A protein has these predicted regions:
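Conserved hydrophobic/aromatic packing and binding residues within compact polymer-binding modules
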Residues: 18-21, 51
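Arg/Lys-rich, alpha-helical DNA-contact motif
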Residues: 3-9, 28, 42-121
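Residue-level "edge-of-site" marker
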Residues: 21, 34, 67
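Minor-groove-contacting beta-hairpin "wing" of winged helix-turn-helix DNA-binding domains
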Residues: 35-42
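Glycine-centered, phosphate/nucleic-acid-interacting loop/turn motifs that mediate DNA/RNA or nucleotide
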Residues: 25
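Short glycine/proline-centered loop/turn elements that form peptide/ligand docking sites
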Residues: 4-7, 14-17, 34
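Beta-hairpin "wing" of winged helix-turn-helix
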Residues: 28-35
Length: 121
């Protein structure tokens, strides 16, 4: 079992972010100890780490909350969860394409400067 501080270190989430996610219903403490401190198990750690990945892809808190609600309903919602993840994956591919276009624009400008062009455009 992990304290909130340990969970923070293991996932890279700030303690305040963990509490925020709890307030939004997308993360829950496994329980509380005698001093009323939150504690978390390994499943919660894995889920918190997955939340990090989802957020890094740009998924909103509300979409993660919807995904979590489906997750909590069990195996019958696997098709809907797959659809959500595929939609998010498509968004990531769009982000990659946009970044590749940005790299091409930078490369083009670098090549122009290296060839002696002084144009600003």
């Amino acid at each position: 079992l992990f304290t909130i501080g340990e969970l923070s270190k293991l996932t890279g989430l700030a303690v305040g972010t963990i509490r925020f996610y709890e307030s939004k219903g997308i993360l829950s403490a496994t329980g509380r100890d005698n001093n009323n401190n939150r504690y978390y198990d390994d499943d919660t750690r894995a889920w918190a780490k997955f939340i990090v990945y989802l957020r890094e892809t740009g998924m909103s808190i509300n979409d993660i909350k919807d995904y979590k609600a489906l997750l909590d309903q069990g195996e019958k919602t696997i098709p809907q969860r797959i659809e959500i993840l595929n939609t998010q994956k498509a968004k990531v591919y769009q982000q990659i394409e946009a970044k590749q276009e940005q790299i091409r624009a930078l490369d083009h400008k670098i090549e122009r400067y290296q060839s002696g062009s002084t144009k600003h455009v």
